[in-house]
C-alpha cells in the first residue's frame, strides 16, 4: 500500500459488485470506504478510504451505493467495501403509532429522507425539523449512527431531502 501513499495516485474504482466477495484479496488490497447516506448517492469523485488511501470513484450510474457493495479497480487488484458512516441524526418517538405516522407524513411531505423502525423514525439532524417535531409533542433525541434511509416510492435516491434548491410545482400544504 505504500506506493499509493507515496505517489498520491488514487486507486481508480470502476466496477461495482453487490453481495458476496468477488475473490480472495490479501488484507493489504482490501479497504473500507465509510460514506454518509448523501455521499453514497454520488458515484463519481475523490474519496478517502478508512486508512487514508486516496480513491477515485468512476462508477456507472446504477443508483446509490449500499453498505456491503464492493468496488473494484479495472485490474480487479483492489477491493473496497462500502460501509455506512455514522452521522448526526434525530430519533423521533411518539406515544402512539398514529402520532408517529403523522410525523412521517409531515416529514415525507417535505421530502425528508427517513429511516423507519418499529416505534421510531430516524432523520438527519436539522434544528428546524427538530423544533417542528417537538411542537407536535413528539420525543426527539440526538444520536450518531449510520443512516440507512428508505429509497423512496419511485426507486429514487434517498438523498432527495431538504438540501435541494429547485422549485416543486406541487403544494406542500398539510390537511
UniProtKB/Swiss-Prot annotation:
Entry's Gene Ontology cellular component terms: cytoplasm
Source domain of life: Bacteria
Bias (Basic residues): 160-169
Keyword hit for tRNA-binding: no
Record's subcellular location: Cytoplasm
Pfam families cross-referenced by the UniProt entry: UreE_C
Region of interest (Disordered), ranges: 151-175
Signal peptide (residue range): none
Gene3D superfamilies to which the protein is assigned, alphabetical: Urease metallochaperone UreE, N-terminal domain (2.60.260.20), UreE, C-terminal domain (3.30.70.790)
GO biological process, one term: urea metabolic process
GO MF annotation, one: unfolded protein binding
Entry's family note: Belongs to the UreE family.
HAMAP family: UreE
Annotated protein name in UniProt: Urease accessory protein UreE
Organism the protein comes from: Synechococcus sp. (strain WH7805)
